[in-house]
């Protein structure tokens, strides 16, 4: 006999992880100034060992909740520091190292050369420091006659992503999103959102679902959104069963609506 409480627990774990992933994705979107309604081209999701299968069991929900076309789930074992950066890099993720000095620890080692050390550190390629730390757990700066050797613990190593991506992380859950903009995909997403709201308005007004109405009108789109869909009025008309769609004040009564922060007015008659 299958224990149903175990099944429930598994489902609950999957949904908890999905919720957390969507939350981290939202944080990455905010950093990138990408609104929830814009579909993402690609997302790379890093999870703990054993969690890939858990998240993949909700594959379609992952896509719809994150509003992403393609995603890849990567299991990682390291949750911080140089080890995490090296693992992400080794897995082919678009990461770049971010290194700072542990100021309190290096004072006694740098002594009077502190200013020069900081300058030299800022001019040194982070990758070369990491390569050296990997080999011998220390890095030596040659400052004139003096050499200052810093241990691995004297560096704070983290990662960032290259300019084509943005990311957010919470412990070992990392979501990296592509900033590549696909206008066709974005237009489709906006049309779908508008059509859904216009169909709801049709229902509210009591129109028969099979009737072809005269027109639908959409006002107050921002310039970006208008540019995406201005040439796609036939697609919208087909979806909402009207003869034509316009973007001018041509109807009697408009309803105010909101699409993920985009305030619009819609009408149908």
Please annotate each region the language model reported:
Residues 1-269:
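Feature 926 captures the class I aminoacyl-tRNA synthetase adenylation module centered on the KMSKS loop
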């Amino acid at each position: 006999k299958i224990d149903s409480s175990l099944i429930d627990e598994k489902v609950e774990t999957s949904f908890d992880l999905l919720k957390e992933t969507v939350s981290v994705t939202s944080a990455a979107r905010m950093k990138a100034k990408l609104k929830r309604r814009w579909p993402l081209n690609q997302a790379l999701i890093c999870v703990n060992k054993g969690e890939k299968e858990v998240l993949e069991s909700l594959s379609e929900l992952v896509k719809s909740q994150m509003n992403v076309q393609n995603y890849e789930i990567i299991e990682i074992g390291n949750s911080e520091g140089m080890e995490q950066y090296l693992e992400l890099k080794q897995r082919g993720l678009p990461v770049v190292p971010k290194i700072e000095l542990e100021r309190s620890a290096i004072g006694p080692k740098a002594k009077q050369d502190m200013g020069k050390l900081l300058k030299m550190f800022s001019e040194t390629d982070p990758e070369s420091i990491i390569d050296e730390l990997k080999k011998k757990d220390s890095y030596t700066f040659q400052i004139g006659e003096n050499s200052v050797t810093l241990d691995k613990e004297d560096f704070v190593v983290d990662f960032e992503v290259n300019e084509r991506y943005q990311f957010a992380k919470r412990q070992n859950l990392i979501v990296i999103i592509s900033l590549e903009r696909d206008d066709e995909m974005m237009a489709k997403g906006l049309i779908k959102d508008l059509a859904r709201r216009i169909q709801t308005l049709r229902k509210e007004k009591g129109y028969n679902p099979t009737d072809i109405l005269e027109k639908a009108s959409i006002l107050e789109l921002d310039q970006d959104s208008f540019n995406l869909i201005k040439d796609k009025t036939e697609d919208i008309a087909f979806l909402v069963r009207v003869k034509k769609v316009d973007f001018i004040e041509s109807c009697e009564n408009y309803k105010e609506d909101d699409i993920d922060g985009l305030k619009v007015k819609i009408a149908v008659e």
